[in-house]
């Protein structure tokens, strides 16, 4: 069975936090002190989690900023591998010892 690609952190936020709590994007934005557009773009995969947003989410949900940024980094790396991984392997060669 193939590994599933990592989910965008906004999808995780929407499915694992907002929906179970019955919380709207607007309510979360107000609780975090950020524009609603930031949360909307995030949960629709159109925006990345920044360190500022990670700190706010961590404080609100009782998690860590590293949790949120780690998810974003994993997602970003997988996207980069899909876009440019083969080209990099073909053109960048390991340094000889």
Residue ranges, per PLM feature:
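Short, basic-rich loop-to-helix N-cap that marks the start of a DNA-contacting helix
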Residues: 46-59
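The alpha-helix within a helix-turn-helix
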Residues: 18, 29, 58
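Residue-level detection of the helix-turn-helix DNA-binding "recognition helix"
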Residues: 33, 44, 73
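Short alpha-helical DNA-recognition segment
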Residues: 22-41
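Short, charged recognition helix plus adjacent turn
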Residues: 59, 67-97
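A short, Lys/Arg-rich alpha-helix, primarily the initiator
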Residues: 1-23, 70
